[in-house]
Amino acid sequence: MRILADENIPVVDAFFADQGSIRRLPGRAIDRAALAEVDVLLVRSVTEVSRAALAGSPVRFVGTCTIGTDHLDLDYFAEAGIAWSSAPGCNARGVVDYVLGCLLAMAEVRGADLAERTYGVVGAGQVGGRLVEVLRGLGWKVLVCDPPRQAREPDGEFVSLERLLAEADVISLHTPLNRDGEHPTRHLLDEPRLAALRPGTWLVNASRGAVVDNQALRRLLEGGADLEVALDVWEGEPQADPELAARCLIATPHIAGYSLEGKLRGTAQIYQAYCAWRGIAERVSLQDVLPETWLAGLQLNPGCDPAWALATLCRAVYDPRSDDAAFRRSLTGDSATRRAAFDALRKHYPPRREITGLRVATGGQAELQRVVRALGAQLV
């Protein structure tokens, strides 16, 4: 097999070395010419895999190490008989860790008690569904809007987007980017909806940049709108709007799901799909390539405050403010310089582990145990 992989996909050799020759390119450089002699294509969301790129190529399998598939022309895949796989849920936990870090930063700035907020989660799939589980596990009030899932689960606890925007004072977006169809999500939060948000609302977008009208959001913030905003995704990536970023509390270069586990899990999942497509046995597993965590565990004093424990456990693993600082330093120079810096921050992202790998002792204190379980850490 002739395999072409995005150079930023990790451990490709560990999984695919015995399957043929492997060539690597930057994801944004993968085009029609690059696919002339390729059987298997492994990509991330930065590569548009379209009819124009694939027509006439020998590509027969496409794997994307992402949850979303809006960069894949699935209609053409079906027409051309091209097998494909995404990696659903691969980085979901990393995104949840990111959102929790943003909420802690917002609470610190606002002097707010996270337990007293009402949370609105838009999109309850792989990422949003996990976030809902964590928030409800902590005992917090959560509203969920997901029209496609509501249609499949008519007895589920769902609300309309209008009700969610009216009642929630924390909104976290986790939808795919759908430009058409029954439930389009491009500019789901457009100028009228953004302008109608309650004063003091916190908004987190770690889904796709165009789910929020970036220009409308910038105008509102420039006009003094009382919002706290955390953006990990941007319209026109890798070109992020520096003026919008300057008005966000947290601004990062599409790294919410960049946990080490998430990256390796994505490669493992497309390898599993590839093996199924070829009808061969899997030779390597995720556990074969996942290194030991740097922080083995934490011991909480049974008398500590649960809110302090929550913040400490989350930040022991990840604090998005470090990524925010690095991103802001990159928002200088001309457009080409900023675009290159955006991709460089992603390419050279430092190892970051998920909270699920953290072992926590609580001395048997029930409320602390509830926090640990809700976060998904390992209770010992």
Swiss-Prot record:
The keyword Nuclease does not apply. The keyword Transmembrane helix does not apply. One of its GO terms (cellular component) is cytosol. Substrate binds at S45, T66, Y258. InterPro entries: D-isomer_2_OHA_DH_cat_dom, D-isomer_DH_CS, D-isomer_DH_NAD-bd, Erythronate-4-P_DHase, Erythronate-4-P_DHase_dimer, NAD(P)-bd_dom_sf, PdxB_dimer_sf. NAD(+) binds at Q126, V127, D146, T175, A206, S207, R208, D232, G257. It is found in: Cytoplasm. It catalyses: 4-phospho-D-erythronate + NAD(+) = (R)-3-hydroxy-2-oxo-4-phosphooxybutanoate + NADH + H(+). Pfam families: 2-Hacid_dh (PF00389), 2-Hacid_dh_C (PF02826), DUF3410 (PF11890). Keywords: Cytoplasm, Disulfide bond, NAD, Oxidoreductase, Pyridoxine biosynthesis. Pathway: Cofactor biosynthesis; pyridoxine 5'-phosphate biosynthesis; pyridoxine 5'-phosphate from D-erythrose 4-phosphate: step 2/5. Disulfide bonds join C65-C90. Belongs to the D-isomer specific 2-hydroxyacid dehydrogenase family. PdxB subfamily. Catalyzes the oxidation of erythronate-4-phosphate to 3-hydroxy-2-oxo-4-phosphonooxybutanoate. Each subunit can be divided into three discernible structural domains: the lid domain, the nucleotide-binding domain, and the C-terminal dimerization domain. PdxB has a unique dimeric structure among NAD-dependent D-isomer specific 2-hydroxyacid dehydrogenases due to the presence of its dimerization domain at its C-terminus. This is Erythronate-4-phosphate dehydrogenase. It comes from Pseudomonas aeruginosa (strain ATCC 15692 / DSM 22644 / CIP 104116 / JCM 14847 / LMG 12228 / 1C / PRS 101 / PAO1). The lineage of its organism: Bacteria, Pseudomonadati, Pseudomonadota, Gammaproteobacteria, Pseudomonadales.
